[in-house]
């Protein structure tokens, strides 16, 4: 593009200006089977009470996941499979670094969370505790509510973790 929008003009996961930018859910409904967008966080693939009332079981194919970017200084792809009052479940994909390791922007959640290392190893920095843990493929990690953390990729290729978070 000729002009790259600034952080203030961009909607992204936990973006500080998301509430001031237009909600695209209604605008995109006219597209029919529209792709999920950042505005769908907390409502994807549908409202939890709607799913419970219908007794619905909903499959989410790989191409239907809600893709959003976490962070602007150290961006990481987040692919949500579900995000509603049931909880939040998906994948975090952190690309390889450039001149050094790649770190995600720090994050913390209102509810408990867990990580499962699919492709690693993944280093989990607990910023406020000044501790680090290395997850090998198949390892899991519990994050109590309010724990500040970031993921670090020391590898030459992308790393991937599956996450479950009760409250973003």
Give residue spans per PLM region.
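A short beta-strand-loop-beta hairpin characteristic of the jelly-roll/cupin
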Residues: 101-104, 108-137
């Amino acid at each position: 593009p000729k002009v790259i929008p600034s952080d203030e003009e961009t909607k992204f996961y936990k973006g500080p200006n998301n509430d001031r930018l237009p909600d695209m859910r209604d605008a995109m409904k006219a597209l029919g089977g529209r792709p999920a967008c950042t505005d769908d966080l907390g409502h994807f693939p549908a409202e939890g009470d709607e799913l419970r009332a219908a007794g619905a079981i909903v499959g989410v194919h790989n191409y239907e996941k809600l893709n959003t970017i976490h962070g602007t200084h150290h961006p990481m792809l987040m692919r949500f499979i579900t995000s509603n009052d049931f909880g939040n479940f998906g994948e975090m994909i952190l690309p390889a670094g450039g001149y050094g390791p790649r770190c995600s922007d720090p994050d913390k959640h209102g509810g408990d969370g867990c990580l499962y290392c699919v492709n690693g190893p993944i280093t989990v920095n607990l910023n406020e505790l000044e501790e680090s843990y290395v997850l090998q493929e198949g390892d899991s990690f519990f994050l109590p509510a309010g724990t500040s953390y970031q993921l670090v990729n020391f590898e030459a290729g992308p790393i991937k973790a599956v996450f479950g978070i009760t409250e973003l």
